């Protein structure tokens, strides 16, 4: 028995020693703090709006190049998208824009939400250092994100009650394109269109001048708003800069509440017809 106990003790001892000499601790993760002299802010160009994108404006106030592998906006106010590849080596610069898409706003049927804090997350390398994950805090509340959240959730509240779309009845009458916007019921509530704005290219003129311009009553499934479109500008430069030509702002209310704006975009075939009509009307060909 003593021999057995001694044998077991000798067998257990190396195991205990090995356990006590466990694997070395993993090295600490590199800090997520931004490099000194490198900062970001958010901006949006007109060309970004139709494609739901923003610019991460990077400032590098140092002489050390910084390589951005990818960039991502993270905030509870918008759905988080995967990191957007940047592959950008930035030397000293007062501002260099990195374009990224941003997710849909997280809206609520209860009303407009408040903006939540945001960060810009990037995988970057400073000089010859290894690539690391860095978190830039966006000053809160950011005015651009505040506007984007307000606009998108205002539209959400309207479209929860009714879809507002271009009808299929658009025809050219003389020098005017005539057709309608169609309101189609989705949920409860009286939806009233108070105004239809034009764009950089087109003047929108409601046929009926009384307010509201159209009303989708509580018991109705559909309503129409007769509309006329005419060219807003006829210079070639205007047609070359057509980034927002078809983003028509429609102001509407639900149950007599606050006016909110929803952007209504004609379908592609109608966009092509409107472009051809405007070019011809302006004497620019087409």
Task: Enumerate the language-model features and the residues they cover.
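Short, acidic/polar linear motifs in exposed loop/turn regions
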Residues: 61-64, 106, 183-189, 256
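Beta-sheet-dominated interaction scaffolds and their linkers
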Residues: 27-57, 61-63, 146-178, 273, ...
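Surface-exposed beta-loop interaction hotspot
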Residues: 125-209
């Amino acid at each position: 028995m003593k021999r057995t106990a001694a044998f077991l003790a000798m067998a257990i001892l190396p195991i205990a020693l090995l356990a006590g000499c466990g694997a070395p601790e993993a090295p600490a993760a590199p800090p997520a703090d931004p490099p000194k002299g490198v900062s970001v802010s958010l901006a949006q160009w007109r060309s970004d709006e139709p494609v739901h994108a923003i610019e991460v404006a990077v400032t590098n106030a140092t002489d050390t190049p910084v390589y951005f592998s990818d960039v991502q906006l993270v905030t509870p106010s918008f759905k988080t998208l995967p990191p957007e590849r940047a592959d950008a080596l930035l030397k000293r610069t007062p501002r260099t824009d990195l374009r990224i898409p941003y997710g849909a706003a997280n809206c609520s049927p209860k009303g407009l939400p408040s903006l939540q804090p945001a960060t810009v997350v990037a995988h970057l390398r400073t000089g010859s250092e290894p690539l690391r994950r860095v978190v830039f805090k966006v000053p809160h509340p950011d005015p651009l994100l505040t506007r984007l959240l307000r606009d998108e959730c205002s539209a959400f509240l309207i479209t929860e009650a009714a879809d507002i779309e271009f009808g299929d009845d658009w025809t050219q009458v003389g020098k005017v394109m005539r057709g309608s916007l169609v309101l189609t019921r989705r949920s409860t509530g009286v939806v009233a269109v108070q105004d239809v704005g034009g764009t950089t290219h087109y003047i929108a003129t409601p046929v009926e001048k009384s307010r509201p311009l159209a009303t989708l009553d509580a018991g109705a499934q559909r309503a129409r708003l007769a509309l006329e479109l005419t060219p807003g500008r006829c210079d070639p430069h205007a047609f070359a800069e057509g980034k927002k030509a078809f983003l028509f702002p429609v102001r509407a209310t639900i149950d007599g509440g606050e006016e909110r704006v929803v952007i209504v975009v004609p379908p592609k075939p109608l966009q092509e017809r409107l472009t051809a009509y405007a070019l011809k009307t302006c004497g620019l060909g087409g």
